Amino acid sequence: MARQINDTFLRACRGEQTSYVPVWYMRQAGRSQPEYRALKEKYSLFEITHQPELCAYVTRLPVEQYGVDAAILYKDIMTPLPAIGVNVEIQGGIGPVIANPIRSLQDVERLGEIDPEHDVPYVFETIRLLVNEQLDVPLIGFAGAPFTLASYMIEGGPSKNYHKTKAFMYAEPKAWFALMDKLAEMTIRYVRAQIRAGASAVQIFDSWVGAVSADDYRTFIKPAMARIFAALREEGAPLIMFGVGASHLVHEWNDLPLDVIGLDWRLSIREARRQGIAKAIQGNLDPAVLLAPWDVIEERVKRILDEGMERPGYIFNLGHGIFPDVQPATLKRLTAFIHEYTSTN
């Protein structure tokens, strides 16, 4: 039987009134923590993510250290890709590198299908270990969105302008939509299995979708996203959408069957709501602010919290991941400040 959890985060996801603003941080588990860096001296990322005990330790560490209101599963967005035939290597200082980039419809057709519990069993072993024994806050599962995954698969690795991805999208629409369908199906199966293993909510990361226009999003990407969220909606867990540099796309997300829209720092919460965003909102402190003196951090955070609390359904987060040189003590102090400043008790 799962342990009793603090459900403040989940209630905020559903747009309910909460006694304080819940908080978690993207990349809260990992590179900014000395315990994690010590672990990386002994184990590779591959080894950590493939060993449930190590992965669970990294996942729960920020909950214990910072007092955040949700844990997010420590995995990489590339985790499910090898199961469908994509050769991925995480190279230090570079990121994911794909040995066999997509160049044609034939390349897409060669991709297989994922059987999550068979192909990546360590993901679900980690989830079950956390929710059954270790966590007293909700666990967030996650996956990369089709566009971001496709960008790596087509570019062969990280890109500054995604020109190969967009050229493929424009020049090979049949192959593009076939790839979106393959990745949508993979995402549905992978995330559904996370929820059924015990994840209480899910965030879909579309890290690079800000590279496309709203018109292109509607044409080339949104159909796959609508399919993903409609399928996952049946599982009953809150669904969160987040993209970087995607302020021009939040209206497209607003009519998808999801619960929470994650904002980066480029669009204020108040402005998003003024423009008609009716879902719960998560965000949106610029992570660089965490490297400033405390008085600067406090002033910026108060401004965001004041906007967020104007309506129920608000979760504090950053507008992207924590930088490696942010001090853990800053995150602990920030979490306590948010809880105290927003408490209605």
Curated annotation (Swiss-Prot):
Pathway involvement?
Porphyrin-containing compound metabolism; protoporphyrin-IX biosynthesis; coproporphyrinogen-III from 5-aminolevulinate: step 4/4
Q: Which Pfam families match?
A: URO-D
Compartment annotation:
Cytoplasm
What is this enzyme's EC?
Answer: 4.1.1.37
Q: Indicate whether tRNA processing appears among the record's keywords.
A: no
Q: Where does substrate bind?
A: 27-31, 46, 76, 152, 207, 320
Q: Which reaction does it catalyse?
A: uroporphyrinogen III + 4 H(+) = coproporphyrinogen III + 4 CO2
Q: Which GO terms describe its molecular function?
A: uroporphyrinogen decarboxylase activity
UniProt KW keywords:
Cytoplasm, Decarboxylase, Lyase, Porphyrin biosynthesis
List membrane-spanning regions. Answer: none
Where this protein primarily resides, as one coarse class? cytoplasm
Q: Looking at the keywords, is Nucleotide-binding present?
A: no
InterPro entries linked: UROD/MetE-like_sf, Uroporphyrinogen_deCO2ase_HemE, Uroporphyrinogen_deCOase
Gene Ontology terms describing biological process: protoporphyrinogen IX biosynthetic process
Q: Which PROSITE patterns match?
A: UROD_1, UROD_2
Site entry (Transition state stabilizer), positions = 76
Q: Provide the Gene Ontology terms for cellular component.
A: cytosol
Q: Which HAMAP family match?
A: URO_D (MF_00218)
UniProt-listed PANTHER family: METHYLTETRAHYDROFOLATE:HOMOCYSTEINE METHYLTRANSFERASE RELATED, UROPORPHYRINOGEN DECARBOXYLASE
Functional description taken from the UniProt entry? Catalyzes the decarboxylation of four acetate groups of uroporphyrinogen-III to yield coproporphyrinogen-III.
The entry sums up its family as follows: Belongs to the uroporphyrinogen decarboxylase family.
Q: How is the subunit organization of this protein annotated in UniProt?
A: Homodimer.
List the protein's name. Answer: Uroporphyrinogen decarboxylase
Species of origin = Geobacillus kaustophilus (strain HTA426)
Q: In the UniProt record, what gene is named as encoding this protein?
A: hemE
